[in-house]
A protein has these predicted regions:
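Class I S-adenosyl-L-methionine
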Residues: 67-76, 83-253
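Short amphipathic alpha-helices and their capping/turn segments at secondary-structure boundaries
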Residues: 61-77, 269-272
Length: 280
């Protein structure tokens, strides 16, 4: 029997990088119940992605502070959240909990109200030295354990570094029973990355093919020449855009706040494997 769909609630969604990555890690089984995103440009991009079939359709709410989480109590398997990094980043002056963009208390309220067993968050590396201890304490108060890691986008082949902190929060009493649902095996691999025993058929979603996932570095002219010959129609869904484009600033801000989907997928698989291994 195929694992059941995973019902997700996405907070501070941005342009959906964390959502796409988690869906990739779970074999395309994420079923969003709702998304919360206040930026009009990002919300419009999400709606466009839904219309194009890139993301599953779901209502998009604009205000995290007034989101009616009580209506979803007991109906959410996994909460996703890329809560604002500016309170913890150097470029945002690291005002921490005093920053008006500090939205963690609202996410904590939603986590408590929905009683979701699992959450996956993303933030900047600087969060480790500002505010992270409070996040862990708040999660512990709700009965969560946590695993975390810092993973650069370059680790999955991107041409930029972009270190990101990924946090997996889980209720130990529930994670074991959800293990087969939340960590499906890739075809040909066991949960720990080994091949299955001789004579045993592989199961689960197919493993991703060995294909180039990113274009060459900006100054790799020979690489770009080969890439464009092989992929003449390649266009990213959101591009920086030249000067003179009215929404150029919105695009840059959206990209600056985004996470590479494959980066999120690798982090989710890594942390879930680690959590399951630590669960008695």
């Amino acid at each position: 029997m195929d694992p059941r769909p995973v019902r997700t609630l996405s907070l501070c969604t941005g342009i959906g990088g964390l959502d796409l990555g988690t869906d990739l890690a779970l074999g395309g089984r994420c079923r969003p119940i709702a998304l919360v995103e206040r930026e009009a440009f990002a919300a419009a991009h999400l709606a466009s992605a839904m219309e194009a079939g890139i993301m599953a359709p779901a209502p998009i709410h604009a205000d995290l502070a007034t989101f009616p989480a009580q209506s979803l109590a007991g109906s959410v398997d996994l909460i996703l959240g890329g809560y604002p990094c500016q309170p913890f980043s150097q470029i945002g002056f690291r005002h921490g909990t005093h920053d008006p963009r500090h939205l963690w208390p609202h996410i904590l309220r939603i986590l408590r109200t929905t009683n979701a067993p699992l959450a996956f968050f993303e933030n900047v590396r600087g969060h480790l030295t500002l505010g992270f201890d409070q996040v862990l304490a708040d999660l512990a108060d709700l009965g969560f354990d946590a695993e975390w890691t810092v993973l650069p986008a370059s680790a999955v082949g991107a041409t930029h570094r972009r270190d990101r902190l990924f946090i997996l929060a889980y209720r130990p009493s529930q994670l074991t029973t959800l293990g087969d649902t939340l960590l499906p095996r890739l075809e040909g691999l066991t949960r720990h990355g080994d091949h299955p025993p001789f004579g045993q058929e592989p199961s689960g979603p197919p493993a991703p093919p060995s294909l180039p996932l990113f274009p060459p570095a900006p100054l790799n002219h020979d690489g770009w020449d080969r890439w464009l010959r092989l992929h003449p129609d390649t266009q990213p869904s959101i591009r920086r855009g030249p000067y003179g484009i009215p929404d150029r600033v919105d695009r840059l801000r959206a990209l600056g706040n985004a996470v590479v989907p494959l980066q999120a997928a690798v982090a989710f698989r890594t942390l879930t494997t680690r959590a399951l291994g630590a669960t008695p």
